[in-house]
């Protein structure tokens, strides 16, 4: 396996699950959003404020291309990374892709106190999350090798299911 790539909506558990998978597989863990922050010295909300979403998405595309070219990495992507066809191609070519699916209720609960999510700076985050999932879900599914439900499941159980399901996949 080249890389293990996690996609899915905000609050699906990509970073938490990714860290655990990396530890289990003894691989480095990378979060594309955190890597952008490290590289720029600015947090994601600041980048959104100063450059707008298109500016952030340009940075994200460059970072995903770089990280997917690596070998032996567990990568958690931002929720909107799949919106650009270039990213979908890079992610699919970069390794095995796992779509972590979470219900809107779970997403709201997991993101409620996180101030680092510019798209959720709204009076009705559930509506925004629902709209985003409706648009993004087909793209997550398009590139996923496997889809994993994360609702009300301990991260360790999700990790074990991912490892078992990956072992069942034919080589590509």
Swiss-Prot record:
Chief localization: cytoplasm
InterPro entries documented for this protein: P-loop_NTPase, Shikimate/glucono_kinase, Shikimate_kinase/TSH1, Shikimate_kinase_CS
Compartments (UniProt record): Cytoplasm
Known pathway: Metabolic intermediate biosynthesis; chorismate biosynthesis; chorismate from D-erythrose 4-phosphate and phosphoenolpyruvate: step 5/7
Enzyme class (EC, first level): transferase
Gene Ontology cellular component terms for the protein in this record: cytosol
Names of the cofactor(s): Mg(2+)
Swiss-Prot/TrEMBL catalytic activity: shikimate + ATP = 3-phosphoshikimate + ADP + H(+)
Binding-site residues for Mg(2+), renumbered to this chain: 15
Residue positions binding substrate: 33, 57, 79, 136
Keywords: Amino-acid biosynthesis, Aromatic amino acid biosynthesis, ATP-binding, Cytoplasm, Kinase, Magnesium, Metal-binding, Nucleotide-binding, Transferase
NCBIfam families according to UniProt: PRK05057.1 (NF003456)
Function: Catalyzes the specific phosphorylation of the 3-hydroxyl group of shikimic acid using ATP as a cosubstrate.
Identification of the protein by name: Shikimate kinase
Taxonomic lineage: Bacteria, Pseudomonadati, Pseudomonadota, Gammaproteobacteria, Pseudomonadales
